[in-house]
């Protein structure tokens, strides 16, 4: 059985933490931030402002027509690529924590309403963990996004 206090952490990571007696407070992410390239920054900012607000994630910074950052520590960025046109990474996706299942559902609905594509309807994903509830979408540039509640 998993210890209380590990919600929001992937089940495989939870197992590792428990096997090594690592607390959530001691656990450090290896990434500082992630960014995705978009073809139209203002349109992408509207899309991400709307979709991420369903997960209680707010835009924290904006450089007009260049990039926008989300999260308290600017963990997620959308922006125009420095070189060449924006293209999505095959096999890449960004997963955002959701506060509850309803937020996952709202993330999915909002993304589709704004021109995103379904990449996996909201539902339980027992192959990732007993309580892993997620939805997958692609933004208008083809970037794959996930909202997950555990």
Model regions: which residues?
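Long, contiguous binding/interaction regions
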Residues: 85, 102, 114, 145-150
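Vicinal oxygen chelate
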Residues: 38-42, 96-140
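Short, flexible turn/loop "capping" segments at secondary-structure junctions
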Residues: 26-29, 84-88
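Residue-identity detector for glycine
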Residues: 5-8
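N-terminal beta-strand motif that seeds the catalytic metal site of vicinal oxygen chelate
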Residues: 23-45, 94
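Core segments of cupin and vicinal oxygen chelate
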Residues: 35-76
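Short, Lys/Arg-enriched N-terminal segments with co-localized hydrophobic residues
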Residues: 11-28
């Amino acid at each position: 059985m998993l210890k209380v206090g590990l919600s929001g952490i992937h089940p495989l990571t939870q197992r590792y933490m428990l096997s090594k007696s690592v607390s959530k407070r001691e656990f450090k992410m290896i990434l500082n931030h992630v960014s995705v390239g978009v073809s139209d920054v203002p349109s992408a900012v509207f899309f991400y402002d709307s979709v991420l607000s369903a997960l209680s994630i707010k835009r924290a910074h904006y450089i007009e027509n260049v990039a926008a950052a989300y999260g308290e520590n600017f963990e997620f960025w959308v922006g125009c690529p420095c070189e060449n046109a924006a293209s999505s990474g095959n096999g890449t996706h960004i997963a955002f924590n959701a506060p509850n299942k309803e937020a996952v559902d709202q993330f999915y609905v909002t993304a589709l309403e704004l021109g995103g594509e379904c990449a996996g309807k909201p539902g339980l994903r027992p192959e990732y963990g007993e309580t892993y509830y997620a939805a997958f979408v692609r933004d208008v540039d083809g970037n794959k996004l996930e909202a997950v509640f555990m």
